[in-house]
């Protein structure tokens, strides 16, 4: 049994309030200073392991607004995979890869005692730094850089001055053709054994974060500061995704120390495409992982602070996102990265029917003044559909763990160091691949599980393991050399589909009728081309794109790439040109990226362009 040291922090002196101060998170107008003093309380059965620097569990006691609080913390043991590595590049381009010891780290999750809705994400590396939610309000805590090293500042998130007044938005505009209307609760209770395979135990998104050269410049070549910033990001991302039963272990950190390895520009869509190609060609063959996010300090175009592909988790090129390091507050950047990973997991922007209990939700198209750490009801339902429809195998396998430190015991049904399997006692073992006496696989075993594994042996090469979902998707076949079905691939973008009504885009065939059907239901019919002339107006709902908050009217050749219009017909009601427009989510109801707008032409960023330009 893992032994735990409990640590209690009490106040050495009374806290006091300050009116204004400049902290790492920015200018803070109202803050509280506390002086924690560490007092250890050792239960008789708890003995700290001598090689361990940071405890597995801790408690911190301090006051907030005169109210005593007890903060319980537990080490986030899913923060790193066992094979975590870091790579940077020499001036002549050579890869320099190290495997730092990260098992005994200082990043924690927690909660406030007697507050069931509280949460916390804290770094205890040098004092306490992070955030916690208390009585429904978000607080930040950080050490003060004073001669008295015990001083900490505690302040409400709302008391941090805004860095600027501009809205900050995700650059994703494509919808997934699914309605955001509430799904009956009963449907959430229907779970087949196949679905249960994904929800219990946790899913794992093995993540590599790539830091570009602009970040190195921003942090003045301080790689330690970059590592700390990234670790805090991933710690918070894990706290966010736990509500979806997803763990996000960091398997690697790439730092482009001397120069960028792709052309990183402010055009988010271009950078995203180039990063996806680099990941597929160079990063994935070198390091197995499920998803990679590019973190950049470059100011992305317009109001965009992030962009990612939708429903592409586990795909070699498209399981990526681009995130701007847009704030001094780590939480805001973490929420942005969680949002983009959410897109990869099949989540689209929340609509008017979506809620997460009164907060601005993770998948809101606009980052709120107080960023939420919660997913909406729509996101939960979309994620479940993504799992059952796409079968993303890569997130099923757990990463190598770093937290099993007790001696292995064969027969306890726990996979521990030195064991290849553990199916329990020989009398109870039901695993034909495992020798229960030795906890080793039988010598003839080729595999244990996977879509290309049957009775502990690889399925024959050519056996279909993932059928094509539609004419834009490819069927995958077993190789005869692996238990895993090959990476999900689809036909090239621009391939004609649906009897030439559309062109393939990222494995789907986007056409206007399908988008209208998803937005308005079955009472829609084909729309008249004349309706799209409204998009030439450049008014509040009818336009092609936005630049610096200004709505740009469509040129005549681009009018089919702005607001979508649908022909709606029901008993006693006929609307020939019905737009879908919601002020809170103006991007929803725009014509999807990749939709056909003419022969050999598709919509791309609000313009009707030739296929060879778009793809």
Curated annotation (Swiss-Prot):
Residues 1-20 form the signal peptide. Its EC number is 3.4.24.-. Disulfide bonds join 314-394, 354-378, 356-361, 410-439, 421-434, 423-429, 433-456, 447-453, 452-478, 465-485, 472-504, 497-509, 516-566, 531-577, 544-554, 561-603, 597-608. Residues 407-493 form the Disintegrin domain. The active site is at 340. Gene3D superfamilies: Collagenase (Catalytic Domain) (3.40.390.10), Disintegrin domain (4.10.70.10). It comes from the Eukaryota. One of its GO terms (molecular function) is metal ion binding. Residues 203-399 form the Peptidase M12B domain. Its cofactor is Zn(2+). Glycans are attached at residues 263, 269, 377, 523. PROSITE patterns: ADAM_MEPRO, DISINTEGRIN_1, DISINTEGRIN_2, ZINC_PROTEASE. Zn(2+) binds at residues 339, 343, 349. SMART domains: ACR, DISIN. A motif (D/ECD-tripeptide) lies at residues 471-473. Ca(2+) 1 binds at residues 206, 290, 394, 397. Residues 21-189 form a propeptide. Expressed by the venom gland. The keyword Amino-acid biosynthesis does not apply. Keywords: Calcium, Disulfide bond, Fibrinogenolytic toxin, Glycoprotein, Hemorrhagic toxin, Hemostasis impairing toxin, Hydrolase, Metal-binding, Metalloprotease, Protease, Secreted, Signal, Toxin, Zinc, Zymogen. Ca(2+) 2 binds at residues 412, 414, 416, 419, 422. Belongs to the venom metalloproteinase (M12B) family. P-III subfamily. P-IIIa sub-subfamily. Snake venom zinc metalloprotease that possesses high hemorrhagic activity (minimum hemorrhagic dose (MHD)=0.82 ug) when subcutaneously injected into mice. May also potently degrade alpha chain of fibrinogen (FGA). PANTHER family: ADAM A DISINTEGRIN AND METALLOPROTEASE DOMAIN, DISINTEGRIN AND METALLOPROTEINASE DOMAIN-CONTAINING PROTEIN 28. This is Zinc metalloproteinase-disintegrin-like daborhagin-K. It comes from Daboia russelii.
